[in-house]
Amino acid sequence: MHASASQDKNRRKPGHDEGAHNPDYENITLAFRNKDQLKLSQSTPTKQAKFKTSLDPAESPPWLYRTIMMLYVLLALVFLSCIVLSALVLVKNSEMSKELWTLKAELSNVSDTVWNIRELQNQQTRIWEAAQGDIKEVKKTLGTVMSSIQTGNDRLKTVPADITQIKKTLEALEKKAQPQPST
């Protein structure tokens, strides 16, 4: 609103009594040496006001095009960096996928090894239990054999007495079987 009032002041002829009815208006007159300076001073704010309010592309400043081009270049660089980062992410993802497959294979091998170890432990437990049963059986058999040997030893102890008894019986029989001399 203030800018439009200053434009109106510049367009009107000097000496127009607009401020007579307005208490905020100050009538300021400037002394210029020639009329060219007056025209330049009056035309400069008008051009500035037109430049600020104008949206015409023909009147846009040259730095605006450079700035827009820089923004496009920055946008292209950001886009390229996104592509590069995406490619890096894909490469890393591929590497991690390979590592995961390797780890999965190693884990499978470890789990197979653990399963084999458990099976071997179960088999070893079964063999140990069978060996313990066989040892108990052998101990029982040894007990029976020892008892039989002891019984045999006890019988052998009586054999010499039996042999002497048999010898005495044989001698007695021999005596009876010999003819007696007649007298």
Swiss-Prot record:
Domain of life: Eukaryota
GO BP annotation list: inflammatory response; Kit signaling pathway; mast cell proliferation
InterPro entries named in the record: MCEMP1
Region (Disordered): 1-26
Membrane topology classification: Single-pass type II membrane protein
Glycan attachment points: 109
Main localization (coarse): membrane
UniProt topological domain (Extracellular) ranges: 92-183
Bias (Basic and acidic residues) ranges: 15-24
Keywords assigned by UniProt, alphabetized: Glycoprotein, Membrane, Signal-anchor, Transmembrane, Transmembrane helix
Residues spanning the membrane: 71-91
Cytoplasmic side: 1-70
GO cellular component terms listed in the entry, alphabetical order: cell surface; membrane; protein-containing complex
Localization (cell): Membrane
Protein name, per record: Mast cell-expressed membrane protein 1
Gene: Mcemp1
